[in-house]
Amino acid sequence: MGVFRFISISLAAVSAANAAQILSMPHAQTVPNSYIVMMKDDTSDDDFNHHQSWLQSTHTHNITRRATIQNAGMRHKYNFSKMKGYSGIFDEETIKDIAKDPKVMFVEPDTIISVHGKVEQSNVPSWGLARISNPQPGAGSYIYDSSAGEGITVYSVDTGVDVNHEDFEGRAIWGSNQVNDGDDRDGSGHGTHTSGTMVGKEFGIAKKAKLVAVKVLGNDGSGPTSGIVAGINWSVEHARQNGGTKKAVMNMSLGGSSSSALNRAAAQAVEQGMFLSVAAGNDNQDAQSSSPASEPSVCTVGSSAEDDSRSSFSNWGPAIDLFAPGSNIISARPGGGSQSMSGTSMAAPHVAGLAAYLMALEGISGGAVCDRLKELGTSSITDAGPGTPTNVLINNGGAKGGKPNPNPAPSPSPSPSQPSEPQQPTPSQPGQPGEPFPGEPQQPTPSQPGQPGEPFPGEPFPGEPFPGEPFPGESFPGESFPGESAPAPAPMPPSPQHPHTPYPGGDNFDFDGLWKKYFGGEHWRKMFSSFWN
């Protein structure tokens, strides 16, 4: 009995000494009792399964004793190739128990992430497309190679997308809803706008790329970090099973307080071959203080205005990789037609679209894409901001007279019905959320969301000529974004709430394995050398 007591006391002392850090987020808006748990890099699948089984038992025991939290339990499970973790609603005692597991790297409070854009007036001139294919501002045409991103898939990790919008021509599908609100549509308009800039026929850069909508933010433009990490994980797995991560681009026009969990998830996506374009933020401050913009491996994008100055709202600093048009950008809106929005949210999809364009044209992927964008860009930005290491504005190569433009497909010549610059589309009947397109039986619907491994809809798009008539002035009621005002949103029908389902549990920890890890000399070396890796 004495020996057992000694062992128990020793284990408790070692566990307390080596407990994972429970991070503090004093300046962030946190989700009550919601946490993200990240495991150490060397955690095996068996270790992770044992931890989940133990967690189920421990959590059930704690809740049975106290029963102070509603809807508690695991929400999301993350399983990248080199990063495992989960999120959920837990009481304080359960979180302390979780932190004692030597396989846990850190525990982070779940915080609120928001879009980086705002709705402004309609019918301003469209200039972003022309700017990225010409050496000087003020050009009137967008010149591009006819490959136009064909064979590349773009993941819109955002508020959802109106996949039925005419500008997507059947190349957009609904992928996943990590908000779990039962509302498979874009009730904000933000995700549809950013997607139009990336792949739209009229407004887009990569006009032949495919698009997958991954909803991680609600109709108010905000959502928890845990759901965004889940959206990244889903996108990586879907890309792996549908053409490969090296033919995939992810756009994240969102951000919030610095989050180790979100940065690690973004880094994992890049490590597995995806290109990530991330908005720098709209606070006119150092982007290093926000996530995922502060993650070094992503391509962090600041916003430029029509005169090549840094947009007054754009964040700056060492995290910035590139600038792209972000002020007064016209793109698609849910239900048909278009609207104008400003923000680094509008700049990031210019980079994502151009990345897809270059990946198709030059066969590059991953980190090489951001480097190539820097090579092709022009040193045009004035007042890039304190500590910003670059003043490069993106360009598709037309500004330097070489690649990528071996077989240009110029915008049509001006005529009374076919203007040379991209114009707003003629109004049409609003698409119904989730309604399948003709000839595309594989497209998921709200009641049948796409799953990783599901094939894309048919390759060719209809190719019908798009009317060149300018869209008459129409004011679109937009969403209100943090720190900014906008007209009241259009009324939306209520949607039911669907709570997350906890993952089931199983066996307890292996005591012999724990003993070896606690008292084996190799444990100490590994713990201190890998804690922050």
UniProtKB/Swiss-Prot annotation:
Residues 405-470, 488-502 have a biased composition (Pro residues). The active site is at D158 (charge relay system), H190 (charge relay system), S345 (charge relay system). It is found in: Secreted. It is an enzyme of class 3 (hydrolase). GO terms for molecular function: serine-type endopeptidase activity. Residues 471-487 have a biased composition (Low complexity). Residues 282-294, 378-394 have a biased composition (Polar residues). Its EC number is 3.4.21.-. Residues 20-116 form a propeptide. PROSITE patterns: SUBTILASE (PS51892), SUBTILASE_SER (PS00138). InterPro entries: PCSK9_ProteinaseK-like, Peptidase_S8/S53_dom, Peptidase_S8/S53_dom_sf, Peptidase_S8_Ser-AS, Peptidase_S8_subtilisin-like, Peptidase_S8_subtilisin-rel, S8pro/Inhibitor_I9, S8pro/Inhibitor_I9_sf. Residues 1-19 form the signal peptide. Glycans are attached at N233, N251. SUPFAM superfamilies: Protease propeptides/inhibitors, Subtilisin-like. Residues 126-400 form the Peptidase S8 domain. It comes from the Eukaryota. Residues 175-198, 282-312, 378-512 are annotated as: Disordered. Secreted subtilisin-like serine protease with keratinolytic activity that contributes to pathogenicity. Belongs to the peptidase S8 family. This is Subtilisin-like protease 1. It comes from Arthroderma benhamiae (strain ATCC MYA-4681 / CBS 112371) (Trichophyton mentagrophytes). The gene is SUB1.
